[in-house]
């Protein structure tokens, strides 16, 4: 322990000395009268429309036409060191999605504070345009905050807190990539646009290795809690979060491979969501996604996605999907997807879906 402390102390001292020298070399005058060194704010928005058909019993053919997402955002930088982003979701009930500022002067160490994505799983921070299929995996949805297994609503994988991250050990010619990526942060635990509900904070961390450019292998850990609000008939209830995840991703030359596994551990217990069904102590999920480029404008994805509510075959929900992405322009995409479900918790486990989605942004 003493050796580790000594190494960390020396590393921080070295980083501080490096920062001072860099500041002497190129520094701007700070002050309330300073109005320069600020980028022009970048404004943008995107819309994802959809048509969904389902032959699930009782689904009446599926939801039909809909608007999956409408989002608008603004981002920019000040002094090139401080970055900011605001993102609002306009579909459904309008609300703030992202709102943060990040000090990002050095690749090795940066600090982000506000409302933003939780550092759990590779897929969670992925833009919906780049997921490949029409929805996030159940690893992300059940374990990162898109309708959490504990009962938390759809927070888009986000929370409010502070995060430290960086990339270490330059590799390749001209520092083309870094060997190690780390993130560690502290969040409220209640999701977006919510105040903290207890004195505890969620701690989430990840350590990732990039042995070759584009290939990341990583592990994630999460320790925290979520508080279900009190109702007229029940007091507030606190649920522990104890989660781990491991996986790999490869993105290079338009080829994509992602695979991840996540599990609830150390007694994380979900609330009873449906009458007559147990509140399972253990759950896990896994997915594998492969994206193959056929042309510059055409890419095909295949995916296996599984969530086991009770960590057993009898409680599994599997989705097998194939999606064709027609990327006609950087800002225009059409997506056609077939999805086969095998949900063992339904009276009739097997059913089919066809999704058509349109993506446009500016």
Q: Could you tell me what each predicted segment is?
A:
Residues 291-335, 339-342:
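C-terminal hydrophobic structural anchor segments
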Residues 326, 332-333, 350-362:
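Outer-membrane beta-barrel "beta-signal"
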Residues 4-48:
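N-terminal periplasmic/intermembrane-space "pro-region" immediately following the signal or transit peptide
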Residues 92, 250-254, 362:
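A generic beta-sheet turn/junction motif
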Residues 208-310:
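Detector for outer-membrane/organellar transmembrane beta-barrel domains
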Residues 54-56, 122-125, 136, 193-195, ...:
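Outer-membrane beta-barrel proteins
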Residues 30-192, 197-204, 208-217, 289-294, ...:
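Outer membrane beta-barrel
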């Amino acid at each position: 322990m003493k050796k580790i402390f000594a190494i960390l102390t020396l590393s921080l001292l070295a980083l501080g000395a490096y920062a001072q020298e860099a500041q002497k070399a190129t520094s701007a005058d700070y002050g309330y009268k300073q109005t320069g060194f600020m980028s022009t704010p970048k404004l943008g928005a995107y819309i994802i429309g959809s048509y969904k058909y389902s032959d699930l019993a009782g689904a009446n053919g599926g939801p039909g036409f809909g608007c999956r997402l409408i989002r608008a955002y603004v981002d920019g930088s000040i002094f090139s060191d401080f970055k900011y982003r605001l993102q609002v979701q306009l579909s459904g009930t309008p609300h703030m999605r992202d709102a943060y500022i990040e000090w990002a002067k050095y690749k090795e160490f940066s600090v982000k504070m506000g409302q933003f994505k939780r550092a759990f799983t590779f897929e969670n921070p992925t833009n919906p345009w780049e997921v490949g299929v029409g929805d996030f995996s159940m690893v992300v949805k059940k374990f990162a905050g898109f309708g959490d297994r504990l009962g938390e609503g759809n927070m888009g994988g986000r929370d409010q807190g502070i995060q430290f991250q960086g990339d270490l050990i330059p590799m390749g010619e001209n520092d083309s990539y870094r060997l190690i990526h780390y993130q560690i942060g502290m969040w409220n635990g209640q999701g977006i646009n919510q105040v903290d509900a207890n004195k505890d904070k969620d701690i989430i961390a990840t350590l990732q290795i990039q042995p070759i450019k584009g290939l990341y292998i990583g592990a994630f850990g999460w320790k925290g809690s979520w508080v279900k609000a009190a109702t007229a008939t029940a007091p507030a209830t606190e649920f522990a979060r104890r989660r781990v995840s491991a996986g790999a991703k490869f993105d290079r030359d338009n080829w994509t491979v992602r695979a991840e596994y996540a599990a609830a551990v150390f007694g994380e217990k979900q609330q009873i969501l449906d009458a007559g069904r147990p509140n399972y102590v253990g759950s896990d999920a896994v997915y594998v996604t492969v994206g193959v480029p056929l042309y510059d404008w055409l890419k095909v994805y295949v995916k296996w996605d599984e969530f086991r509510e009770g960590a057993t075959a009898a409680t599994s929900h599997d989705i097998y999907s194939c999606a064709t992405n027609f990327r006609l322009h950087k800002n225009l995409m059409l997506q056609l997807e077939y999805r086969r479900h095998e949900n063992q918790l339904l009276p009739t486990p097997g059913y089919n879906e066809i999704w058509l989605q349109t993506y446009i942004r500016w």
